[in-house]
Amino acid sequence: MHITIFRTLYKHVIDHDLIERMLKRNNIAFEKTGYDAGSRYKIISDTEEAMVSFKKRLREVYPQIPLSA
C-alpha cells in the first residue's frame, strides 16, 4: 500500500474536479479536506504503478504542486 499527502492552493488549482477524476482514473482512493487557502489530499493506492502514473500526470498539469518522489 502506498500513501501520499499533498496540498493544493486555490490560487494555483482552479479545477479540483480534474485532480479527483485523475485519481479515480488511476483507481486511487483519496480523502479530501478543505481549508481556507486550498485543499489537502490523502491518497492511497495498492500499486506503485498507479501512484507513479498519477504523480507524473499531476506534475504535467500542475507543476507547482509539491509531491514527494
Where are these regions (language model features)?
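Short, surface-exposed ligand-recognition loops at beta-strand->loop->(often short) alpha-helix junctions
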Residues: 3-15, 47
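A general secondary-structure signal for short beta-strands and their flanking turns/coil
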Residues: 1-3, 38
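Acidic, low-complexity, intrinsically disordered interaction modules
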Residues: 16-51
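Conserved short beta-strand edge segments in small beta-sheet-based binding/regulatory domains
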Residues: 31-33, 59-69
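Charge-rich, low-aromatic oligomerization/scaffolding segments with amphipathic character
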Residues: 50-62
